[in-house]
Amino acid sequence: MKFSEICTFAVIYAAYLAARRGKRSRAATAHYEVRLLENIVNLVYILKTKIYRPGVFRVFYVYEPKKRLVQAPAFVDKVVQHAIVDNLLYDRITRSFILDNYASQKNKGLHFGLDRLKRFFTDYWNKHHTAEGWVLKCDVRHFFASINHDKLKEKLKKLDLEPVVYDLLCIYIDCSDGLPLGYQTSQLFALLFLDDFDHFVKEQLHIQYYGRYMDDFFLIHPDKEYLQFCLREIRAYMDSLGLELNEKTQIFPIRNGIDFLGFHTYLTESGKVIRKLRHSSIKRMRAKLRHWEKEYPAGLVTREQILQSWQAWDAHAAHGNTWALRQQVRDRVQNILKEEI
């Protein structure tokens, strides 16, 4: 599809539906919908005439699971980004990705990555008949904020994009230092930025058991000295991109388990894989329960808000060996609401 083909009512309306998904209750979405037909017709026009320019983004902090600065685009810019990413960029950028690049892709994601790690552990035990071995666990320091614009643009040029698309993407890139969290394009750009690195680990370092979720990745290997060599090579590669690994990067025994994607996954000597929910997630849920016990009787939180939050946590926790913990939390929620759920 070419840029001119996304400048139609049908494509922009579909992009609008994608942009509003899960956000219909927000003021910006409601404001756009008041004059929906007029807004879409106008957006098609300014895209066709190539006079579209992104607006000012909204800046705020999120605090779960950790404090992060988010730069959210205006709703109309979210619509444009969906139109471009979904129709022009996604397939072109992701077609070279390795299987074990897990973030922000169709049919992948957090739980796909967890299942791949489990498969790696099982395969490792079947191959070596032991849980002895080593893990190199890495995390890129301030990944989004550290992405070099010129190097990213070089990677985009290799995609052979139309000039109008490339120029528009450069505007998104240059709207802030690094890449702004909250932009759909930023997620895809971040994946692209380390795509060559993924191939380097798999094809040059010959690491069979490797997985990455955005800036968080692991290598599993029976030889500690080889992982020490890999770490030196990885640091050099990151330096060439203007990135650095943070202080959490370390090499440790497989038997310690891997803290990845919200769970601590262990390989036992018998070959069993055990997945435990990260302690910080349990701690946050217990804090919520204490707040709900005070706030619900006072009318400061609704039944629907409690159920929505609990159900999201429970669905995530269900991917681990957490039956007893989930029952405990469920019982407390039922006690707060005074009803069975």
Residue ranges and their predicted role:
Residues 51-54, 207-214, 284-297:
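Short, conserved aromatic-histidine micro-motifs
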Residues 84-87, 234, 238:
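PAPS/PAP-binding and catalytic site of the sulfotransferase fold
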Residues 39, 46, 115-214, 219-235, ...:
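Conserved polymerase palm-domain catalytic core
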Residues 73, 78, 82, 172-175, ...:
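Right-hand nucleic-acid polymerase module
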Residues 1-152:
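Conserved two-metal-ion catalytic palm core of "right-hand" nucleic acid polymerases
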Residues 103-112, 218-221, 253-257:
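Beta-rich nucleic-acid/ligand-interaction surfaces
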